[in-house]
Every structure is written in structure tokens, then in C-alpha cells.
């Protein structure tokens, strides 16, 4: 059945390199899609943040966010705010549409991770080097430290952290392979468990439409757990529901991403510019994407709704997409390719408005369909863009003036070329002295030029 769907609709994972984003002499360090994949933010090593319109691949905004490399990016739920963290020990929040800085918070050590609350852009979780994660409230300013008060783990610091998809829980991983789950409201630890390894958990990934969480561990194994199973644990060792790893090269993973449904998992190798794609439920390796040799991967992100992956290596953002092959016979089985031009002979009644041989039932149905009223004024939200936990798809409808609601795209003003050269010549010839030949102007006015002036 899967093979039939793949032949009909195509594989839902990237297959080849399509292009590179134009960074305008910048060196990329990390990237992040907004919730719908219409805008992508790219953090650079010089502290700048470039905002791209993903449809046109052009830069819509540029923020001078930090003075050192940007380490992490996070979008708010409505796409109007962008949170950045940097090696300069600070995080910053920007209004994407206005291009203004809203908040900046400085810390005592380098910030490696920052993430908006999935449902509240006034809160964010921040992780510093060798410190416990903190929950930051921007207005009013409140900071709360997530303490590790589990038995026998007082000296363990968190190595990674993330919200679940609804923002009800905070999931933290430690340097000894433990998973801690906090209530996002009370900030109390409600569950903790151990992986079957004591290696450091480097990353926690939560798919947008899945009840699973994925961990990237130092032992080079990518594990998938069901969140509901972890909520009932009190220090027990938990076996992963699915595991994927590189059986041949034993590669370690710099970064891991997944599609919105959690059906595919992509691992970015630390040794080379290679992307490994597995089926998460079977663990079978289905594709390896190879970039240029000698490049080291820094980040990888999967598009929220399309089979597109962005990878960053050596400061360059590469876009991997599907291999599109034209197959017209899939749309019209009777389609035939011609070796040379032929004159087409029209069949009788082929292009008539009414088919005399058609059934009466079909004619009545077509007439009823023509009488249907089509709404061309109101915007109808698409369900496939919403995650599985959406309460109401109408919250995805932006306002017509873009002052409220989700920000799907950034409007760009028209750039009229040679606007200054559109000059109208005045009727009075006295105003043309600067534009015309002086001799011609003097002759038109009835003056005679001396030989020296010629």
C-alpha cells in the first residue's frame, strides 16, 4: 500500500539539492522556520539575523541582534515575534513586522538555547552553559529557575530543554541520560526517568503533529518516546519506542529534525555534510543526502508543511527538495508524445458547450453545481496548516491590515526603478538653461554669441 501511495503522490522527503540562499556575504550559523514555513530566519556569525520570504527567497528584514554569533532562534505562535540567543550572554525579542527591539535580557554565561512558550509569547525558556534552565517572563520581568530536585541528581545540570507541543510541560535532558518533565505552570518536576544509557542528551525534538518526543544522545542513537508513557515514570529506566542509528559509519549527530507528522527523522552528521533520513516507525534508512566534501554541518531544519530541508554548513544555507519529474500520462492516460508536429483533426461535438449524448442526471448535477455560491470575500483557513492540537482553525486568519492575527508574510514596498529620472520639461525655455546646449538656448532667445563664447 505504501508503494502505491509513493508512486501516486511521491515520497514525502527531500531527494536532491535545489539551491542555496543568498546571504549577501554573511555566514550563517542557525536557521528556523515560522509556524507555516512561509518565513525563515537565519542567524549569522556576526550577530545579524536575516528574515527571508521563503516563496521568493529574498531578504525581507535584517536585524542587528547581537555582537557575537547567534546560537538559537525561536518564533512566537502568531509569527509576529522572533526570539534570538547569542554567545554574547543575552537574548533579544524583535517585532518582525515593525523591525524593532522589544526586550533584551543579559545573563552571566553564554546562552545556548531559547524557546518561546508555544501558547504565550510573554514567556520563554532559556538554557545557559553549565546552568539549570530558567523560565523568563518578559512583562513584568520574572525569572524562575527549574531546580533538579530528583533523588540523587542534585549535581546534574540540564544539557537540553524544550516545551511540549501544547506548552503544558517542559522536558529537560541531563548530562547522564535522564529526562525530567516539569509542569509549565507550577514549574514543579512531575516525572523523571532514565534512558538505557548514561550518555549526555544533546537535543530534544517535539514534532508539531505528534504525541512523541525525540532525543539525540551522545551515544549516537536517536530515540523516540511517547510523552504519555514518560509522565507516569518515577525514576525507572524506559525503553525507547523507536531507535535509529547509523549502523555502518557509527556517525554522531550534530542536529536532528523531523517532519511535522513525525513520520521521518533526519540526522545531520558531525563529520561531513551528510543528511540521513529514516522512517521513524520502522527505523529503516531510506535516503542519504550528501553535500560538498569537507564541510561541517551546523544546523538542519525541516519545513513545517512541505518535504524541504534547510541545512547549514560552512556558513552556507542549502535547500534540499524533492526530485520533480514531469509525467503527463499520470494526469491523462491517453497522453502521447509526438516526435514531430501534426495537424489535429477536431472531433465532432468535441468542444461544444452542451453534450447531446450526455445523461440527463449528469446535466442536472452540473447545472446545480453552477448555481452554488462561491465566497470570494472571506478567507477560509486550511486545516492542513494547523497542528493536531488546534482548538480553532480561525485563529490562523490574519487581519486585512496585518495589525493583528498571525503574520504569514512580510509585505515589501514596491521598488520603482529610475524614479528620479522621470522629469517633465517645463514650457518656459528659461528653465532649460541647465539641460540644453548654451549656444542653442542663446540662439532661441535672440542673442548672438561672440567668437570667444563659441
Swiss-Prot record:
InterPro entries: RBBP5/Swd1, WD40/YVTN_repeat-like_dom_sf, WD40_repeat_dom_sf, WD40_rpt. PROSITE patterns: WD_REPEATS_2 (PS50082), WD_REPEATS_REGION (PS50294). One of its GO terms (cellular component) is Set1C/COMPASS complex. It holds the Pfam family Beta-prop_VPS8. Disruption phenotype: Strongly reduced di- and trimethylation at 'Lys-4' of histone H3 in embryos and adult germline stem cells. Mutants also display defects in egg laying and fertility with defective germ cell development. RNAi-mediated knockdown disrupts development of the ASE left (ASEL) neuron, causing it to adopt the ASE right (ASER) cell fate. The keyword tRNA processing does not apply. The keyword Transcription regulation applies. It is found in: Nucleus. Keywords: Chromatin regulator, Nucleus, Repeat, Transcription, Transcription regulation, WD repeat. WD repeats lie at residues 23-64, 65-104, 153-192, 196-235, 248-288, 292-330. One of its GO terms (biological process) is egg-laying behavior. Component of the SET2 complex (also known as the SET1/COMPASS complex), which contains at least set-2, swd-2.1, cfp-1, rbbp-5, wdr-5.1, dpy-30 and ash-2. Required for di- and trimethylation at 'Lys-4' of histone H3. Regulates left/right asymmetry of ASE sensory neurons, via its role as a component of the SET2 complex. This is Retinoblastoma-binding protein homolog 5. It comes from Caenorhabditis elegans. The gene is rbbp-5.
Amino acid at each position: 500500500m505504501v508503494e502505491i501511495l509513493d508512486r501516486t503522490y511521491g515520497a514525502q522527503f527531500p531527494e536532491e539539492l535545489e539551491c542555496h540562499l543568498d546571504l549577501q556575504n554573511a555566514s550563517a550559523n542557525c536557521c528556523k522556520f515560522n509556524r507555516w514555513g512561509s518565513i525563515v530566519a537565519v542567524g549569522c556569525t556576526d550577530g545579524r539575523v536575516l528574515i527571508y520570504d521563503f516563496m521568493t527567497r529574498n531578504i525581507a528584514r535584517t536585524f542587528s541582534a547581537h555582537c557575537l554569533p547567534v546560537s538559537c532562534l525561536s518564533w512566537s505562535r502568531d509569527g509576529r515575534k522572533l526570539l534570538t540567543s547569542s554567545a554574547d550572554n543575552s537574548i533579544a525579542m524583535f517585532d518582525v513586522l515593525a523591525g524593532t527591539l522589544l526586550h533584551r535580557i543579559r545573563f552571566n554565561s553564554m546562552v545556548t538555547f531559547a524557546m518561546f512558550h508555544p501558547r504565550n509569547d510573554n514567556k520563554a525558556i532559556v538554557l545557559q552553559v553549565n546552568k539549570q534552565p530558567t523560565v523568563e517572563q518578559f512583562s513584568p520581568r520574572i525569572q524562575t529557575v527549574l531546580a533538579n530536585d530528583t533523588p540523587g541528581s542534585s549535581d546534574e545540570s540540564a544539557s537540553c530543554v524544550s516545551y511540549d507541543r501544547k506548552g503544558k510541560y517542559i522536558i529537560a535532558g541531563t548530562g547522564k541520560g535522564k529526562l525530567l518533565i516539569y509542569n509549565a505552570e507550577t514549574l514543579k518536576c512531575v516525572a523523571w526517568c532514565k534512558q538505557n544509557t548514561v550518555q549526555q542528551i544533546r537535543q530534544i525534538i517535539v514534532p508539531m503533529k505528534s504525541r512523541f518526543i525525540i532525543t539525540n544522545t551522545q551515544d549516537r542513537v536517536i530515540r523516540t518516546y511517547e510523552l504519555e508513557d514518560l509522565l507516569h515514570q518515577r525514576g525507572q529506566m524506559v525503553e525507547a519506542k523507536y531507535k535509529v542509528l547509523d549502523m555502518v559509519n557509527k556517525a554522531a549527530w550534530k542536529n536532528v529534525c523531523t517532519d511535522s507528522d513525525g513520520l521521518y527523522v533526519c540526522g545531520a552528521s558531525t563529520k561531513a555534510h551528510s543528511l540521513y533520513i529514516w522512517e521513524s516507525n520502522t527505523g529503516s534508512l531510506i535516503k542519504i543526502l550528501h553535500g560538498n566534501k569537507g564541510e561541517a554541518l551546523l544546523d538542519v531544519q525541516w519545513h513545517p508543511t512541505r518535504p524541504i530541508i534547510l541545512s547549514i554548513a560552512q556558513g552556507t544555507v542549502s535547500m534540499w527538495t524533492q526530485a520533480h519529474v514531469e509525467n503527463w500520462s499520470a494526469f491523462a492516460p491517453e497522453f502521447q508524445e509526438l516526435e514531430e508536429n501534426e495537424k489535429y483533426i477536431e472531433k465532432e461535438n468535441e468542444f461544444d458547450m452542451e453534450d447531446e449524448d450526455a445523461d440527463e442526471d449528469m446535466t442536472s448535477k452540473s447545472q446545480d453545481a453552477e448555481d452554488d455560491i462561491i465566497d470570494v470575500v472571506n478567507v477560509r483557513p486550511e486545516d492542513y496548516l494547523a497542528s493536531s492540537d488546534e482548538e480553532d482553525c480561525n485563529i490562523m486568519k490574519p487581519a486585512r491590515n496585518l495589525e493583528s492575527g498571525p503574520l504569514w508574510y512580510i509585505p515589501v514596498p514596491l521598488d520603482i526603478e529610475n524614479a528620479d529620472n522621470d522629469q517633465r520639461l517645463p514650457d518656459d525655455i528659461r528653465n532649460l538653461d541647465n539641460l540644453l546646449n548654451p549656444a542653442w538656448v542663446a540662439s532661441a532667445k535672440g542673442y548672438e554669441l561672440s567668437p570667444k563664447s563659441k
